[in-house]
Design a protein with these regions (language model features):
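C-terminal motif of bacterial Sec signal peptides marking the signal peptidase cleavage site
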Residues: 18-22
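Bacterial signal peptide processing site
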Residues: 24-27
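Short helix-initiation/N-cap motifs at beta->coil->alpha
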Residues: 48, 95, 110-121, 165, ...
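Extracytoplasmic small-molecule ligand-binding "clamshell" domains
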Residues: 58-133
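Extended ligand-binding regions for polar small-molecule ligands
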Residues: 94-103, 161, 177, 182-184, ...
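Short helices/loops that flank or line small-molecule/ion binding pockets
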Residues: 102-103, 111-112, 116-129, 143-145, ...
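Flexible hinge/capping segments at coil-to-helix
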Residues: 147, 159-178
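Periplasmic-binding protein-like
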Residues: 152-159, 222, 226-268, 286-293
């Protein structure tokens, strides 16, 4: 019925414009909107409300609830998103994504993506959000609507433990060959340093390159380094040395999506009731949490 009303409104618009032009007599008083105009909502993200208005039909929240799933784009990135022994996706981000989906009345579905294609995956509606320890760079914030930052992080240099003493400054890194995840903050850092590097699909693959000796070093997230290298891990002979920067993590949604504001509302409540801290302590990221304003 709404579609018929819209069609009728479009057909009548020229006639109404002529009629109003003839009868206005210079009266500039605002004309009330038609009764069947659909409601709109202002959406916002980490940078505050935007000027974009979404109709009910364009609402991502309504879209998610209608299909019953929140499709989350991820990569294998411990301790944020990774599989347990049974193949289920777990991790701090994965657990919180499930809780967010539950707050919307839907199920979370996880899809591994090529990190370079994350914006294309979002815009093509193959996924509904990117929730994978994503650094809030200017590039990310210009291409997506993002929730408020929730975690602090840094990029660090990973080298064999036996060589760590030789690589304690940025200057000492110049002659090293690096492995970095393509499209990542680590790639940005190695380009800034002017070092040679090999792009790989994931940060986990970058560690494999160093372990195999095909690359001298890797640049990965500090949170991942803390979880995946050193004594008691699969990479006991690797360590990290130089901390290259500091950054913040956030969740990305389609540009103009009302899911960003829904996330902010959810996160504030989940932080207040202890859900966030419980998950953070489970995966050892509690010291990196950013308290909501």
């Amino acid at each position: 019925m709404l579609k018929k009303n819209r069609l009728a409104a479009l057909l009548l618009a020229p006639c109404l414009c002529l009629s109003l032009a003839a009868c206005s007599g210079g009266n500039s008083a605002a004309t009330p909107a038609p009764a069947d105009t659909e409601p709109v909502e202002t959406i916002g993200g980490a940078d505050g409300p935007t000027d974009i208005l979404l109709t009910e039909e364009e609402s991502d929240v309504a879209y998610i609830q209608d299909k019953g799933t929140l499709v989350v784009g991820i990569t294998n990135f411990e301790p944020m998103d990774y599989r347990d022994a049974s193949g289920e996706w777990i991790g701090f981000d994965a657990d919180m994504a499930k809780a967010f989906a539950e707050s919307l009345g839907v199920e979370a579905e996880f899809v591994e993506i090529n990190w370079d294609n994350k914006v294309l995956e979002l815009d093509g509606k193959n996924i509904d959000c990117v929730w994978n320890g994503m650094t809030l760079t200017d590039e990310v914030k210009s291409a997506m609507s993002t929730g408020n930052a929730y975690c602090l992080n840094a990029q660090v240099v990973v080298v064999p433990a036996g060589k760590a003493a030789d690589y304690q400054t940025e200057e000492s890194l110049k002659d090293l060959s690096f492995a970095v995840e393509s499209g990542s903050a680590g790639e940005d850092e190695v380009e800034r340093l002017g070092c040679s590097f090999t792009p790989v699909q994931t940060q986990a693959n970058a560690l494999l390159e160093v372990k195999a000796g095909t690359s001298d070093a890797a640049i990965i997230d500090l949170l991942m380094a803390g979880a995946m290298i050193g004594e008691g891990t699969s990479y006991p002979d690797l360590t990290y040395t130089v901390k290259l920067n500091s950054e913040e993590y956030g969740v990305g949604f389609r540009k103009g999506s009302d899911l960003a504001e829904a996330f902010n509302t959810f996160w504030e409540a989940a932080y207040a009731d202890g859900t966030v801290m419980t998950a953070a302590e489970t995966y050892g990221v509690q010291e990196s949490l950013i308290k909501p304003d």
